[in-house]
C-alpha cells in the first residue's frame, strides 16, 4: 500500500504537472501524447451510445415505410 501525504497550498503551488483530457490525450508543457487504447475505446463507446440513442428515439425508422 502506498503512503499518501496531504499537501498544503504552498506545496501544491510548487507542483508542475500536465493535463489529462480523459479521452486518451495528455499534454505536458513541452508535448502531447495519445494513449491509443483509451482514445479508441472512448470513441468506440461514444459511437455505440449514439447509435443506440438514435434507434431508441425512433431515428432508426427514418426512410422506412410503415
From Swiss-Prot:
Primary localization class, coarse: secreted
GO cellular component: extracellular region
Keywords, sorted A to Z: Antibiotic, Antimicrobial, Bacteriocin, Disulfide bond, Plasmid, Secreted
Signal peptide range: none
Pfam families in the record: Bacteriocin_II
UniProt-listed PROSITE patterns: BACTERIOCIN_IIA (PS60030)
Cysteine-cysteine disulfides: 27-32
Location in the cell: Secreted
Annotated function: Has antibacterial activity against Listeria and Enterococcus.
Name of this chain's protein: Bacteriocin carnobacteriocin B2
Organism whose genome encodes this protein: Carnobacterium maltaromaticum
Amino acid at each position: 500500500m502506498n503512503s499518501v501525504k496531504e499537501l498544503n497550498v504552498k506545496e501544491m503551488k510548487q507542483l508542475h504537472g500536465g493535463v489529462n483530457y480523459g479521452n486518451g490525450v495528455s499534454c505536458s508543457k513541452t508535448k502531447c501524447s495519445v494513449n491509443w487504447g483509451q482514445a479508441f475505446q472512448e470513441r468506440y463507446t461514444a459511437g455505440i451510445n449514439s447509435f443506440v440513442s438514435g434507434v431508441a428515439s425512433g431515428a432508426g425508422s427514418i426512410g422506412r415505410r410503415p
